[in-house]
Swiss-Prot record:
EC number: 3.6.1.-, 3.6.1.22
Reactions catalysed according to its record: a 5'-end NAD(+)-phospho-ribonucleoside in mRNA + H2O = a 5'-end phospho-adenosine-phospho-ribonucleoside in mRNA + beta-nicotinamide D-ribonucleotide + 2 H(+); NAD(+) + H2O = beta-nicotinamide D-ribonucleotide + AMP + 2 H(+); NADH + H2O = reduced beta-nicotinamide D-ribonucleotide + AMP + 2 H(+)
Organism: Mannheimia succiniciproducens (strain KCTC 0769BP / MBEL55E)
Co-factor remark: Divalent metal cations. Mg(2+) or Mn(2+). Binds 1 zinc ion per subunit.
Residue ranges of domain Nudix hydrolase in the record: 128-257
Similarity comment: family membership: Belongs to the Nudix hydrolase family. NudC subfamily.
Gene: nudC
Function of the protein: mRNA decapping enzyme that specifically removes the nicotinamide adenine dinucleotide (NAD) cap from a subset of mRNAs by hydrolyzing the diphosphate linkage to produce nicotinamide mononucleotide (NMN) and 5' monophosphate mRNA. The NAD-cap is present at the 5'-end of some mRNAs and stabilizes RNA against 5'-processing. Has preference for mRNAs with a 5'-end purine. Catalyzes the hydrolysis of a broad range of dinucleotide pyrophosphates.
The keyword NAD appears for this protein: yes
Binding-site positions, Zn(2+): C99, C102, C117, C122
Subunit details: Homodimer.
Family annotation (PANTHER family): NAD-CAPPED RNA HYDROLASE NUDT12, NUDIX HYDROLASE, NUDC SUBFAMILY
Designated name of the protein: NAD-capped RNA hydrolase NudC
Motif Nudix box, residue numbers: 167-188
Residues annotated to bind a divalent metal cation 2: E182
Amino acid sequence: MQLIRSSDYGFWLLSQGSHIHLVNNYLPEGRAEDFHLQGKKGMVIGELDRQPLWLVEEQPNDTRAYFDLRDQLYLPERTFNLLNRGVELNHFFKTHQFCGKCGDKTMQTEDEWAVQCTNEECNYRTYPVICPSIIVAIRRGKEILLANHRRHAPKYGKGGMYTTLAGFVEVGESFEQTIHREVFEETGIKVKNIRYFGSQPWAFPNSQMVGFLADYESGEIRLQEEEIADAKWFRYDEPYPEFPEKGTIARALIEATLKLCAEHQDK
C-alpha cells in the first residue's frame, strides 16, 4: 500500500472485518480529502464505474458507519466480488504481519498482492490464503435434499433456513472426494453424477465456495447432529422452507435443481 494523497480520486473501500463503510448504501466516491483519507495507506484494487477502487488499510478505531458485506448481495456480481477482494486483502494484511517461517516482520510487496519477510536471509513470500469449500445441491427424481444447519436453527430446536450441504476441502482431497465425504458425514447419503456448477468468493473471512450439482445414489438420512438440526427431501411443487438469499451460490444451486426436478416430473 502507498500513502494516499489529498487529490487521489475514486471509490473508497474501508472495511472492519467483514463489514464495509457505506454512504447512502454505496461506497463513497470523491477525492481522498473529502473523506479525510489523505495520509492513510491504500491501494487501487480494481475499477468500479470507470473509476479507481481504492482499498484503505483497516482503521480499527474508525467511527464511520459500517455495514455487513452479506447485505450487499443484491449488487452486480462483479461489484460484490470486488468488495470481497478488498475485505479479504485487508484480512490477509492484518493477519500476516509476521513471517510464518522465521517470525520477523513482513512488508507488503510492490509487484503483487503478497507480503514478504523483511529478514534478508529469509525473504519468505506469502500470498492471500483462500480456503476452498464445496457446496452441493442433491436431487432425487423430483425431490431436492435440503438441510437445516445448526447455525441457522433456533436455539435448541429446528426451523429457520434450509439450504444445501457444504464443507471445507481437506488437505489432499479433490473437490469430488470432499463432496462424497461431507454429504455422507452430514446426512448418511451417497451421491453420484457430480457436475461443476459455478463458484463464488466468500470473504467470511477468506473462503471460495465451489458449487456442484449431484444425484442421489443410495442411503437413508442419518444426521450428524452436532452440525445438522434437520434434513429432508422436498418435492419441487410443494411449499418450501426459508431459502438462502438471492445472490448466494446456495440459492442459485437450489433454483437450478428445482428446475431439474420439474423437468424430471414432466417426463
